[in-house]
Structures are given as structure tokens and as C-alpha cells.
């Protein structure tokens, strides 16, 4: 049986992982493509851990077998068998490649299934991901900057060497940036980023990365420090599109698309409520920076815009609060941040100008 030790190759191949750690461990950090089919649930793992501390390894192992026996053992075994049949190139994975993955491997062998496991477990894959990010972050980086609504993310996605950090983080960076998909844990985000870097690097002779000019955090996720340090020093190409064009991009992204996504996911009534709460939450998140009086004024305008959209389908009313929000908050904030990096700016132009400039590099 070929147990896995070529960790980079396993990550590059999107190898399916049958992760037998407890749910709480999986939620704290997992590899892309892993499915969680625990040998022990959280309470069972906690009981075994307590037993180990008080009575030693043999007693803990015996308790584990008592907790996972009979119908419970059979149900979990059937789930592992089904997962292996679905992913015949999959590997078993536990925390460190120890007891749990070996026990599941042995139980599967007793049914005639030879499923390899990851030697060193999740910890070995995690260390490989951290090392890969550090190594690949040493390559040159070019940042795409510009005010909100400049189409930076779209531009990055079009580059063969572009890394969509916001897509990986499941967040678009601003107070209105959340999507319908919950953000990953910090470790899972870092793992996903590492795999993306490895894949792009393997596809081509890479001169440099193209990334969006991000802050330290994207929603609840923060960029790995090794990458952040390189981005602070990187050259920047700045997109400067007309204000009207930026407004249309934001209309499409935040009002039309998000309304569609919420209603598609939850139905018309619940979807509308979720969409309305999403916009209110985005404004509420920056209330102190706006000042409470201005926040109250913009909230009233938002309420009127939502009423108009609900009755007529028109998103025009949203411009009455979006325009001042850009003029008074987002644009001054970004321009202030950009001024501090003025020495790093290597090109300015419209979205198309920057796209053409990138092709010529």
C-alpha cells in the first residue's frame, strides 16, 4: 500500500482526503477537497483525551473502542466505504498519521478495501502548505490598485499568474464584502491559498504574481505575514476609471447580483429579507467612521432605496446613499492609503489601459 509522503504532489493533484479527525479539529483547519468523516465525534474525542491524561494510552485506546463499537462503528464504516468508492484515489488523514487513520485503514482492509493514508497526517500537509506559501511568496509581485468599483478583481482573474485573494477568502474586502458562502477558518484559508499558488506555479514559467492591492485582512481572514511583507514592497498598477463606470460595476455587484443570489438561495421573501439585512449590516459596520448622524441619514436613504427596489425593481435609489458613501468614506480612505505607497506606483490608467499594459509586460 502506497501511503502518502509526497505532500506537494498530493496537494497539487487535489487528492481527495477522508479526514477522520473530530469535527472541531476539521473546522479549525482542513485541506481543500477534504471531507470530514470522523472516527470519533467531539465528545468522544474529549473523553478519550481525558482518559489518556489520567490513565494512559492503553486505557484511552480501550475507551475509544468501547465508544465506537456496534451500530456506531458499522455506520461510520459504511460512510468510509462509500467515500472510498466515490473517491478511489483518496487517502485517509488524521491529525498526525497516528492511531485514528491506522484504525480506520485496518477496519477498511477487513472489508477488502485498501485505502492509503497520509503519513504525518494533516499536520504534515499543513507544514507543507506553510512552507510552499513562504517559498512562492519570494517571487516578484505586482499589485492592482484602484478605488472601490474599479474592476480590480476581474482584472486579476484574467491574468494567468493572477491570484484572486478575495475569491479564496470568500469576501470582497469592504464592509459590504461578504458573500453567501461563509468564510473559511484562518488555517483553511491559508491552506487553500497555498494550493492555489502551487497550482499556478506548476502551470507555467512564472515571472511574478499579480494580486489585488489588499489590506492586512480580507473579512475575517488575514493574509500570511510572509506574503503581506512582500506585498507592502511591491509595485502597483492603479486603475482609474470614470466614477460613473465604477457606480455601474457596484450596482451590478452589490444590488443586482446579491439580490439575485439571496433570493435564489432562500426564496423571494426570505431572500429579500437577507439581502436587506446584508446592506444594512454593511452600513452599520462603518457607523463610527461615518459619524452616527451621517450613518442615520444614509440608513434612512437606504431604507427608501430598498422600498423602491421592492416595489419597482429599480436599483436607482441606491445611488443616493452609495455616491456619498464613496465620496465621503471609501475614496478618501483608499487615496490616503495609496498616497503612502506613491513611490511604488508604476502605472496609472483606465481598466483597459492597465489590461493592455499587463499584456505588454
Curated annotation (Swiss-Prot):
It catalyses: 5-methylaminomethyl-2-thiouridine(34) in tRNA + selenophosphate + (2E)-geranyl diphosphate + H2O + H(+) = 5-methylaminomethyl-2-selenouridine(34) in tRNA + (2E)-thiogeraniol + phosphate + diphosphate; 5-methylaminomethyl-2-thiouridine(34) in tRNA + (2E)-geranyl diphosphate = 5-methylaminomethyl-S-(2E)-geranyl-thiouridine(34) in tRNA + diphosphate; 5-methylaminomethyl-S-(2E)-geranyl-thiouridine(34) in tRNA + selenophosphate + H(+) = 5-methylaminomethyl-2-(Se-phospho)selenouridine(34) in tRNA + (2E)-thiogeraniol; 5-methylaminomethyl-2-(Se-phospho)selenouridine(34) in tRNA + H2O = 5-methylaminomethyl-2-selenouridine(34) in tRNA + phosphate. Residues 11-134 form the Rhodanese domain. InterPro entries: Rhodanese-like_dom, Rhodanese-like_dom_sf, SelU. Disulfide bonds: none annotated. It is an enzyme of class 2 (transferase). Its EC number is 2.9.1.3. One of its GO terms (molecular function) is transferase activity, transferring alkyl or aryl (other than methyl) groups. GO terms for biological process: tRNA wobble uridine modification. The active site is at residue 94. Keywords: Selenium, Transferase. The keyword Transferase applies. Signal peptide: none annotated. It comes from the Bacteria. Involved in the post-transcriptional modification of the uridine at the wobble position (U34) of tRNA(Lys), tRNA(Glu) and tRNA(Gln). Catalyzes the conversion of 2-thiouridine (S2U-RNA) to 2-selenouridine (Se2U-RNA). Acts in a two-step process involving geranylation of 2-thiouridine (S2U) to S-geranyl-2-thiouridine (geS2U) and subsequent selenation of the latter derivative to 2-selenouridine (Se2U) in the tRNA chain. Monomer. Belongs to the SelU family. This is tRNA 2-selenouridine synthase. The gene is selU.
Amino acid at each position: 500500500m502506497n501511503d502518502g509522503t509526497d505532500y506537494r504532489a498530493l496537494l497539487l493533484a487535489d487528492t481527495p482526503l477522508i479526514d477522520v479527525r473530530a469535527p472541531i479539529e476539521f473546522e479549525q483547519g482542513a485541506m481543500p477537497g477534504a471531507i470530514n468523516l470522523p472516527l470519533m465525534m467531539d465528545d468522544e474525542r474529549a473523553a478519550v483525551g481525558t482518559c489518556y491524561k489520567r490513565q494512559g494510552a492503553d486505557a484511552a485506546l480501550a475507551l475509544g473502542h468501547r465508544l465506537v463499537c456496534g451500530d456506531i462503528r458499522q455506520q461510520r464504516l459504511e460512510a468510509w466505504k462509500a467515500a472510498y468508492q466515490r473517491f478511489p484515489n483518496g487517502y485517509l488523514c488524521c491529525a498526525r498519521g497516528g492511531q485514528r487513520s491506522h484504525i480506520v485503514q485496518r477496519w477498511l482492509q477487513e472489508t477488502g478495501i485498501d485505502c492509503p493514508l497520509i503519513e504525518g497526517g494533516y499536520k504534515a500537509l499543513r507544514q507543507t502548505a506553510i512552507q510552499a506559501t513562504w517559498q512562492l511568496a519570494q517571487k516578484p509581485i505586482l499589485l492592482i490598485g484602484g478605488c472601490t468599483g474599479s474592476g480590480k478583481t476581474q482584472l486579476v482573474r484574467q491574468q494567468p499568474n493572477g491570484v484572486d485573494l478575495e475569491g479564496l477568502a470568500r469576501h470582497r474586502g469592504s464592509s459590504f464584502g461578504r458573500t453567501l458562502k461563509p468564510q473559511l477558518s484562518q488555517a483553511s484559508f491559508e491552506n487553500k491559498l497555498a494550493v492555489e499558488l502551487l497550482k499556478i506555479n506548476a502551470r507555467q514559467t512564472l515571472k511574478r504574481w499579480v494580486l489585488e492591492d489588499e489590506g492586512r485582512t480580507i473579512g475575517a481572514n488575514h493574509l500570511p505575514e510572509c506574503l503581506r511583507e512582500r506585498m507592502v514592497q511591491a509595485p502597483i498598477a492603479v486603475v482609474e476609471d470614470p466614477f460613473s463606470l465604477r457606480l455601474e460595476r457596484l450596482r451590478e455587484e452589490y444590488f443586482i447580483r446579491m439580490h439575485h443570489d439571496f433570493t435564489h438561495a432562500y426564496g423571494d421573501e426570505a431572500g429579500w429579507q437577507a439581502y436587506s439585512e446584508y446592506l444594512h449590516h454593511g452600513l452599520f459596520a462603518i457607523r463610527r467612521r461615518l459619524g452616527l448622524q451621517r450613518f442615520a441619514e444614509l440608513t434612512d436613504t437606504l431604507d427608501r432605496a430598498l422600498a423602491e427596489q421592492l416595489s419597482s425593481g429599480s436599483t436607482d435609489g441606491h445611488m443616493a446613499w452609495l455616491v456619498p458613501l464613496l465620496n465621503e468614506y471609501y475614496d478618501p480612505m483608499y487615496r490616503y492609503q495609496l498616497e503612502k505607497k506613491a513611490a511604488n506606483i508604476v502605472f496609472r490608467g483606465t481598466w483597459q489601459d492597465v489590461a493592455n499594459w499587463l499584456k505588454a509586460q
